[in-house]
Amino acid sequence: MSVQKVRVERKIGDSVLSFETGHIAKQAAGSVLVQYGETVVLVAAASGTPRPGIDFFPLMCDYRERLAAAGKFPGGFLKREGRPSTKEILSSRLMDRPIRPLWPAGYKDEVQVQACVIASDLQNDGDVLAMIGGATALHISPLPFKGPLGSVRVGKVDGKLVAFPTADQLEQSELDMIVSGSRDMVAMIEGFANEMPEDEMMEAIGFAHDAIREVIDLQEEFYKKVNPEKTPYQSPEDDGLLQRLTDAYYSDFKTAQQTSGKQARAEAVRAVRDRAMADVIPDPNAADAVCVNRFKSVWHDLEEKVVRDLILAGTRPDGRDHNSLRAIHCETDLLPRVHGSALFQRGETQALITIALGTSRDEQRVDGLQDEYSKKFMLDYNFPSYSVGECRPIRGPGRREIGHGCLAERSVAPVLPSADDFPYTIRVISDITESNGSSSMASVCGATLGLMASGVPISNPVAGISVGLVQDGPDNWCLITDILGTEDHFGDMDFKIAGTQNGITGIQLDLKVTGVTNDIIRATLKQSREARIEILKKMLTTIPRPRREISPTAPRLLRTKISPDKIGALIGPGGKNIRGIQETTGAVIEVDDEGTVLVASSNKESAQEAMRQVEACTATVQIGKIYDGTVSSIKEFGAFVEILPGRDGLVHISEMSGGYISSLDQVIAVGDAMKVLVIDVDEHDRVKLSRRKALEELGEEDPLAVEGEGGGDSEGGGDGEDRPRRRRGGSGGGGGGGRGRGPRRSGGGRDRD
């Protein structure tokens, strides 16, 4: 690519969107710097020669975020970015989906589109800019891309639709949706909402399309200034093989496609294909790979034609009409020990759900360009190869699994209770144990069942459905509810919509055609709602509402709020107090900087005991209140008594008893229980206690006063209450009494200092 520096810009939404090329990445087939606000994304497209024998279009879209774009360093030992994060994988999929259908039929050159966020203002996300940049880079490249294509993110803040909302606005938004499209049609939708009614969702899509047209206007202006030379692409010539196979095997193939059952249907189709292959290639072992791949490609086209013709004629492969759902089966509580489990089956698609409930220690920490945050809800989607009867290498989750998991997670999230109402960290695992279409929506339904079975108080149950499309011209099209894998593969659309009886929570549109009209979208929303309500009714016959109690095997969580200045008292010196509570009760205690204390235990009794000790440890000492204390240490001048966990007060020897006591360690011992009254808390938060006044207020006899009646010499005898008064006047009798007074006064002074 060799052009002079070109730049165009236009205000869209609240900021300026700009494209620039001819300055950076000039050797790429097409490159563009996209800027919105102070977020800048570099997008470059490149192309390679097709690999021999390839039978698919090898398009790869990749999105990355350089943390230096926000002035940050990657965490960990190696201070550089590694494998893509979940956010980067999801953004890569967003780039790919609207671009993929916009290529000539039969085009198999390798194409890569790479996007990198190189500056971020932390308000304008780079994902939608990468989508715009990917389409723009391809549009100004020599490649035969059928652009232009625009994208926009839409929010709804305070009842008003907003194009390109900032991160702060999205925090308050009831909608987060990205829409891609051409000037006349919508090409892709990915959105999440708080139970938004269908008519409001349709309004938001129309609003997004208006903004998309503004983006396309800017792309067209950019295209004219760059004025690229497009390389013409010649589609492969028709060798007549498709017509030959159609004439010979269309009828047999049509019959095979109407066989009931996925496995039986696949075997019937395979039998017809094997006969056709033997006709075209008598000796497959002697044929070259090009010939075999050509047959497979043409046979795929014939299969597509048969399936689409059947659907347009009103017949689906499994015999249903266009609006019917497959048979639905729901179960809960399949598994022991787990905190919740469910099974959702729709036809030959089956999702096994397990639920785990944990504490804040189990939250997932997420770091990226934005400030680090934690997630209290996670939904993991797994798609093992046995679910479709195949053997494949066993690896970690791929892009598809991460994408499906995110769709299901964000579709369920709006109905979850707040952390204040339900402090548990929630993990949902959806294992797809059988698959024949729409497994992500089965995960949504199964997750709802599992959450209700585990006692999570969701506000409304959520169900999901996928609606397909077969179109033969602008006026000949039909929608099909609850699509099979075959219908997904050969159809034109996979429109997944999840929600409650009140409205939509998740929406995802994928197309194999260049776009669909608003009429098709509106009809799909209406048809999907009817199916969703029917599914919800069947789910609620299995479990009508969330259980009131969580599983007996789940941790018991109790929560309280303490004053932040009491956090130190709870933790204690070196963690002594909090560690002691945990060791004696077996509970786990967590406290945050705001004073929220969470107590978790495997059983209710230990959690309650730990909470009692936490409350005692952080309670405020009240003057005039009587406490049941324990002697923690004895000095010559008095005794220290623990009245709350980790909180001691001093009972001066003069406040120990109404009688005379010559030596405290002769009448009390460490560990003795003692009732004391708080008489003062000084400015240094030191507590002064009185055993004598506590007993007087309670009207109880003081055994120490009785023991002290005979204390001292003859001069110190007499009434016990008179003796301390005489000693305070300096006329104490007896050497023992006099000797004891001096050190007590001295010791008391040292304590006060």
Curated annotation (Swiss-Prot):
Residues 555-614 form the KH domain. Signal peptide: none annotated. Residues 624-692 form the S1 motif domain. InterPro entries: ExoRNase_PH_dom1, ExoRNase_PH_dom2, ExoRNase_PH_dom2_sf, KH_dom, KH_dom_type_1, KH_dom_type_1_sf, NA-bd_OB-fold, PNPase. The keyword Oxidoreductase does not apply. Pfam families: KH_1, PNPase, RNase_PH, RNase_PH_C, S1. Its cofactor is Mg(2+). GO terms for molecular function: 3'-5'-RNA exonuclease activity; magnesium ion binding; polyribonucleotide nucleotidyltransferase activity; RNA binding. One of its GO terms (cellular component) is cytosol. Its EC number is 2.7.7.8. Mg(2+) binds at residues 488, 494. Residues 730-740 have a biased composition (Gly residues). PROSITE patterns: KH_TYPE_1, S1. Gene3D superfamilies: GHMP Kinase, N-terminal domain, K Homology domain, type 1, Nucleic acid-binding proteins. It catalyses: RNA(n+1) + phosphate = RNA(n) + a ribonucleoside 5'-diphosphate. One of its GO terms (biological process) is RNA processing. The keyword Lyase does not apply. Belongs to the polyribonucleotide nucleotidyltransferase family. This is Polyribonucleotide nucleotidyltransferase. It comes from Rhodopirellula baltica (strain DSM 10527 / NCIMB 13988 / SH1). The gene is pnp.
